[in-house]
Regions:
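Sec-dependent bacterial lipoprotein signal peptides
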Residues: 1-19
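Glycine/tyrosine- and acidic-biased, solvent-exposed loop/turn segments at the edges of beta-strands
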Residues: 2, 20-222
Length: 222
């Protein structure tokens, strides 16, 4: 989960007043959480063959580590659902013709987070992560973290869309202050903060801003 503390720039309409940024100085944004899970107990692939004495046809199998529901043949799940149980999470995979669908995986975490998307030896690829507080992220993941391009929306409907690195806003992106997206800041972000030159839009007015370590140091009207 990311929390945002830095507030909106005030809309400034008089050029003579454009000598500084809003008094609502941006603060840091909270750190995100890693969404990795321990797969040391049993691998996804070996779970499909780790059963014995299951009748052919439709049925189910369950032990302490995993559960299968669907059609079985020769002690293998041919079509159905494979569910793996870990100490911190539950993983659900679809199986078709003995093949696991790694593009549509569901992960439910004990802390209330939920992930749906691709799986490559963990949460990697494209997916959607929802947090128990109402925040959500949709985009690229690598090694259980937000990496690549994606959109993070807070429960108050503010959103950031752009580049991510190791669960932080890094690179080019746009931060929308509210749901109607009429007020936003577009530019470069570094470690969850605006950095360098960015363009601020508010009520059809456009401003050029300069940022240093999340603090707006200069603003001018275009």
């Amino acid at each position: 989960m990311i929390s945002k503390k830095w507030g909106s720039l005030a809309c400034l309409f008089v050029v003579s007043l454009l000598t500084a940024c809003s008094s609502q100085e941006p603060n840091d944004i909270h750190q995100t959480q890693s969404v990795t899970t321990d797969l040391s107990d049993i691998s996804v692939e070996t779970a499909l063959t780790a059963i014995t004495n299951v009748s052919d046809g439709k049925g189910s199998y369950k032990d302490d580590h995993f559960e299968m529901n669907g059609t079985f043949l020769n002690d293998k799940l041919i079509d159905g659902v494979l569910i793996l149980y870990y100490t911190d999470s539950t993983l659900t995979f679809s199986v078709k013709d003995e093949k696991i669908d790694f593009d549509h995986v569901s992960v439910s975490f004990e802390d209330g987070e939920n992930y749906k998307g691709q799986w490559e030896d963990g949460i990697s690829g494209k997916g959607t992560l929802t947090f128990k507080n109402g925040d959500s992220y949709e985009g690229d993941f690598k090694n259980g973290k937000m990496n690549g391009s994606g959109t993070y929306c807070w429960k108050d409907q503010a959103c950031y869309t752009g580049s991510w690195k190791e669960n932080q806003m890094n690179g080019n992106g746009t931060y929308f202050y509210d749901a109607d997206q009429t007020e936003y800041l577009s530019g470069t972000f570094r470690d969850n903060k605006p950095y360098g030159k960015a363009t601020y839009f508010c009520e059809n007015h456009k401003y050029t801003t300069i940022w240093s370590d999340g603090v707006c140091t200069k603003i001018s009207y275009e």
